[in-house]
């Protein structure tokens, strides 16, 4: 099954040269794919367009077999494709770790009991149960990164978009993150400047250069 298909995506920020000039991409169920390219090439922009967080100037976004055009079209997409932002502080906004992780399931209409059960399961699966009642903003950068992943996995997505997931991670937490991600069943689209991490998790690579994916 094709999870995500981007066709001839074009995008420019107002007053600036085009960032994307005909970028096309396809992600299949279970596939793991890395996107490389220099800073400012448009990799993060491509992720945001894929989830309807930005609107392309031209081109089409198709997810789960349906073309997505307006905000309402992307509600389902954001339930089924999880995005791990480059900066964990953009994603963690509740007082405690448990509340951050429960937010997604509650937003999907789960009961409080169901959401709390999901918190326990996700933290147990990731061996992070010791962080459950911690104050989120007091976590280390590495802990925040792992909790951010937990918040996304609590939504039970079918694919993950990972934007520089090793940022702020020490060697130990990077190895732990790789171990966790390698054991997941989801399709993964990875942006990372870490060649060893890319090679281990998503060795198939496309390059974003001059606004196109090659």
Model-assigned labels for residue ranges:
Residues 51:
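Helix-to-loop junction immediately C-terminal to a conserved catalytic motif
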Residues 135-139, 143:
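Conserved ABC ATPase signature
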Residues 113-131:
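Conserved ABC ATPase "signature" region
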Residues 59-69, 77:
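Conserved ABC transporter NBD signature motif
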Residues 1-6, 10-22, 71-73:
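A short, flexible loop at the N-terminus of ABC-type nucleotide-binding domains that lies
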Residues 36-38:
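The feature captures the beta-strand-to-loop junction immediately N-terminal to the Walker
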Residues 160-163:
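Catalytic Walker B motif of ABC-type/P-loop ATPase nucleotide-binding domains
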């Amino acid at each position: 099954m094709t999870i995500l298909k981007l066709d001839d995506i074009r995008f420019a920020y107002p007053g600036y040269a085009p960032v994307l000039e005909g970028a096309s991409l396809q992600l299949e169920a279970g596939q793991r794919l890395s996107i490389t390219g220099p800073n400012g090439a448009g990799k993060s922009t491509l992720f945001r367009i894929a989830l309807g967080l930005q609107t392309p100037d031209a081109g089409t976004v198709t997810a789960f077999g349906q073309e997505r055009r307006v905000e309402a079209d992307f509600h389902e997409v954001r339930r089924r494709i999880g995005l791990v932002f480059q900066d964990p502080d953009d994603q963690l906004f509740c007082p405690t770790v448990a509340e951050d992780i429960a937010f997604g399931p509650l937003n999907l209409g789960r009961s409080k009991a169901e959401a709390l059960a999901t918190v326990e399961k996700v933290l147990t699966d990731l061996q992070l149960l010791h962080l459950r009642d911690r104050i989120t903003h007091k976590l280390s950068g590495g802990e925040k990164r792992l909790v951010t992943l937990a918040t996304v996995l609590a939504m039970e997505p079918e694919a993950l978009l990972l934007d520089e997931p090793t940022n702020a991670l020490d060697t130990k937490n990077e190895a732990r993150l790789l171990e966790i991600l390698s054991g997941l069943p989801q399709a993964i689209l990875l942006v990372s400047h870490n060649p060893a991490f890319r090679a281990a998790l998503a060795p198939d690579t496309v390059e974003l250069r001059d606004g196109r994916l090659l």
